[in-house]
């Protein structure tokens, strides 16, 4: 009576065994196909530029994770090579101005600077021969520095000198800044914090006073103030403590910004810090009087 069951068990064992390995093989195959598809999409996404400047910057990713292949223009000018070594000292005063002049214009407009304009800015009043010699020598020196840092080159195209960076390998804070402000009406708190982090190193090239730079500095200051105030007045701004930070940051660019003062005082009041709100107002009207030599035309109760 026990014979037939034993025969059944004996014949079913290899079936189960082969079925098991069949499913295992299919699982491995599906895993490999899925992994390959994910890798393909990841690489494709990395190399296709997005039309949305907001999506181009990840909100949960800090702008400056490390100093490797990094150029800072906000605050002190600094440039770091791929190993994170500060190579700013390699730039003589003239080379530094040449580099910054080309960098700012290249990042801003993508074309760089017209050759004649470059000569006019750096060697105005010199003979044509002197200008040619100076340009040739300093361009060669700049190329020598750039050749040592990779993924960056000095080019001349259609009469324009420009610097070209591969932003997959380089972080340039001014480039990230321009990406952020292109869609200032769409910025949320996360992206405002990115801008805050970017600009908190200081004003744009704060220790450099080139005449040609004044226009860029004024434009950036106005843009930063504009972006922060647009956000502060939007429906997205509902964090009073963050609004106070924004107001304080605007004051770094404009000491007597009436809008920043109102934002700060109202935010402090909403937190129940009425005495601090009044103190902030008093500091503002004192600075206003010193700068404009006249009294501010509103009282505290009017702005709250």
Give a label for each model feature.
Residues 1-14:
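Membrane-proximal extracellular "stem/stalk" segments
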Residues 11-23:
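Short, low-complexity patches enriched in S/T/P/G
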Residues 21-263, 269-304:
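Intrinsically disordered, low-complexity protein-interaction/activation regions
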């Amino acid at each position: 009576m026990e014979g037939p069951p034993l025969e059944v068990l004996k014949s079913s064992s290899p079936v189960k065994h082969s079925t098991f390995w069949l499913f295992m093989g299919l699982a491995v195959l599906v895993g490999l196909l899925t992994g390959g598809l994910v890798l393909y999409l990841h690489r494709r996404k990395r190399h296709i530029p997005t039309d949305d400047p907001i999506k181009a910057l990840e909100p949960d990713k800090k702008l400056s994770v490390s100093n490797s292949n990094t150029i800072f223009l906000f605050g002190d000018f600094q440039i770091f090579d791929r190993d994170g070594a500060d190579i700013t000292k390699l730039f003589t005063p003239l080379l530094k101005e040449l580099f910054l002049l080309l960098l700012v214009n290249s990042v801003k407009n993508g074309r760089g600077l017209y050759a004649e304009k470059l000569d006019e800015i750096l060697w105005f009043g010199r003979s044509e021969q002197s200008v040619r010699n100076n340009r040739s020598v300093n361009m060669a020196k700049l190329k020598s520095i750039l050749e040592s840092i990779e993924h960056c080159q000095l080019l001349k195209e259609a009469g324009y000198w420009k610097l070209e960076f591969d932003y997959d390998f380089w972080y340039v804070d001014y480039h990230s800044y321009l990406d952020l402000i292109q869609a200032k009406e769409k910025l949320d708190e996360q992206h405002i914090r990115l801008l805050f982090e970017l600009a908190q190193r200081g004003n744009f090239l704060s220790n450099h006073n080139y005449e040609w730079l004044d226009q860029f500095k004024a434009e950036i200051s106005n843009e930063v103030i504009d972006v922060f105030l647009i956000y502060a007045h939007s429906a997205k701004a509902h964090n009073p403590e963050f609004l106070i930070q924004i107001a304080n940051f605007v004051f770094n660019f404009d000491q007597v910004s009436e809008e920043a003062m109102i934002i700060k005082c109202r935010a402090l009041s909403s937190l129940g810090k009425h005495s601090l709100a009044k103190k902030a107002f008093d500091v503002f009207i004192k600075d206003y009087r010193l700068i404009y030599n006249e009294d501010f035309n509103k009282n505290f109760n009017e702005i709250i």
